[in-house]
Amino acid sequence: IPRITSDRLLIKGGKIVNDDQSFHADLYVEDGLIKQIGENLIVPGGIKTIDAHGLMVLPGGVDVHTRLQMPVLGMTPADDFCQGTKAALAGGTTMILDHVFPDAGVSLLAAYEQWRERADSAACCDYSLHVDIPRWHESTKEELEALVRDKGVNSFLVFMAYKDRCQCTDGQIYEIFSLIRDLGAVAQVHAENGDIVEEEQKRLLEQGITGPEGHVLSHPEEVEAEAVYRAVTIAKQANCPLYITKVMSKGAADMVAQAKRRGVVVFGEPITASLGTDGSHYWSKNWAKAAAFVTSPPINPDPTTADHLTSLLSSGDLQVTGSAHCTFTTAQKAVGKDNFTLIPEGINGIEERMSVVWEKCVASGKMDENEFVAVTSTNAAKIFNFYPRKGRVAVGSDADLVIWNPRATKVISAKSHNLNVEYNIFEGVECRGMPTVVISQGRVVLEDGNLLVTPGAGRFIPRKTFPDFVYKRIKARNRLAEIHGVPRGLYDGPVHEVMLPAKPGSGTQARASCPGKISVPPVRNLHQSGFSLSGSQADDHIARRTAQKIMAPPGGRSNITSLS
C-alpha cells in the first residue's frame, strides 16, 4: 500500500476557524500533524509556504455517509473508493465514513474485511466504516461485539424499510438498540415505513406508473416522518443514542427537532441533496435525468424543504451533513427503465457538500463560519469519537486542512465534476465558497485547481466506544433509571376465570386465570396449597360456576382489596 511522505508546510496569514472560535495565526505542519500555531513561528528553512491572507483555514470536511461500494442487483457504484475519495478531496472533504453492507449469506465480519481490503488499496483520503445490519439472528450479537472490540467500529445501522430484504421489526430494533447501548456504540436508522412503501409500489405499478416519478410517489413524506417517530420511541425506551441517516423531508426533520427538545439523545443527518436541490426533477421528461435523482428516502418535491432543513441545521436541531454518495451510470440506472422499483438507488454529493452547505447556510446568513465547521466536520468527529484528531485545527491534530475562499464562486456541472457519471443532480447550482488548497495527512492534494491524489494513501481510522459527546447523558440516565417494584401484601381477593382460546391443533379450549395471577379455591387451606407455577390448580377438575357472588359485611372486609 502506498504511503505518502508528508510535506513540511507553513500556512501564513490565514484566519483559523474552529467550531467555537476564529483567530488569525500562522500554522506549521510536519509529519502529517499540526505542530505549531501562532505568530512569528520558528520553522526550518526551505519549506513550502502557503499564503492564506484573506482566506480561512478550516478543519478538513468529514462526510459521515458514503456508499462507495454498495452492491445493487450485482452492480457496484460508478464512483468507487478511489474515484469517490478523489472527488471528496476536490470539494474539501478529507475523511469519509462509508457504510459496509453485507451481501446475503456474508457475515458482518467478512463484509467488514471486504470493505477494508477495497478501501485500503484505493482510498485517497482517510476513512472509517459504519456497519449495516441487514439481517438479525443470534450470531449477530457476537459479531457486533467483535467489531467493537477488535475492528474499531462504533456505529451500526438498521433498516426500517426494504421489506423482505433487510427490514427489521420493531421488536428486533429494540433488541439491537439495547445491545448497541451496552456496547457503547451509536445506533443509526434508515427511517421509512417499509410496509407502506411496498403497498404503494404495487398500487402504482398496477396503475401503469413505471417511471422515476413512481419512486417519489411510493415514498410519501409521511412514511419517513412516521418511521423517525417510531425509531425515536424505540431508542428512548432502550435508552440508546439514535442517529437518523438521510433526513430528507420537513416532517422527518421536525420529528428529530421535537425529540431533541424533549431531551432524547438523537442526531439528524441531512445530506447534500436534501439541502441543495429538490425532487421536482422526478417528473423530468428526460428519463435518465429523472432516474439520476432516485434515492431513498427520496429528495422531497416540496421546493421549500431545503430552506427548512438549512434552518434546522443552523439552529442545531440537525447536527451533521453527509452526502449518501452512491452513484450509478445511466446504463446502470436503466436496469429499471420499465419498473421504477428496479432503478438502483443513489445520488452524488461527496464533492459538492462543503460548497452547497456554505452557499445555502453561510452565504445566506443563516449560520456563521464556526457553525459551518461544526456541521461539516466537528460534530461528526465528536459523535463518532475521532475528535480532536479530526474536526479541529489544533496542535497535535491531524493535518487535514482546507484553505477556504468564501468569495470564490463556481457553477456545479457534470462537465467539470470529478465523478464517473453523466448527470449531476446539482447541475447549474451556483455556489459561493470553495476550497483553494486542500491538505490531507499533511500533504497538499489540491492546489490551483490541480488534484494530486495517491490511491491507497487513505488510512483506516479506528474509533473507540462510548463517545462522551453522545454517552455522558446516556450514562447519567442509566443511573437514574433503575426501576423498583412497589412493595405490596399478597392479593387474596377473587380472581375471575377466563377461557383462553384453543392452541392451534389442540381442538379444546383451556380454562385459566389471567397469566401471572394466583387463582384460589373458595376455601383456602394454608397447609395444602394448590398453587403451581403453571397457573393450574389442584381442584381444576371440579366443575364450578364461572363467577361467584362474594358476600361481605357492610363496609367491606378489611383486607388488601379494600379502598381504605
Swiss-Prot record:
Example GO molecular function: hydrolase activity, acting on carbon-nitrogen (but not peptide) bonds, in cyclic amides
Domain of life: Eukaryota
Any Pfam family hit: Amidohydro_1
UniProt function note: Necessary for signaling by class 3 semaphorins and subsequent remodeling of the cytoskeleton. Plays a role in axon guidance, neuronal growth cone collapse and cell migration.
Gene name of this polypeptide: Dpysl4
Organism: Rattus norvegicus
Keyword Cytoplasm among record annotations: yes
UniProtKB keywords: Cytoplasm, Phosphoprotein
InterPro entries, per the entry: Amidohydro-rel, Hydantoinase/dihydroPyrase, Metal-dep_hydrolase_composite, Metal_Hydrolase, Metallo-dep_Hydrolases_sf
Disulfide bond sites: none
GO biological process, one term: neuron development
Gene Ontology cellular-component annotations: cytosol
Homology family: Belongs to the metallo-dependent hydrolases superfamily. Hydantoinase/dihydropyrimidinase family.
Subcellular location per the Swiss-Prot or TrEMBL entry: Cytoplasm
Protein name in the entry: Dihydropyrimidinase-related protein 4
Subunit text: Homotetramer, and heterotetramer with CRMP1, DPYSL2, DPYSL3 or DPYSL5. Interacts with PLEXA1. Interacts with FLNA.
Residues carrying Phosphoserine: 529, 536
Annotated Gene3D superfamilies: Metal-dependent hydrolases, Urease, subunit C, domain 1
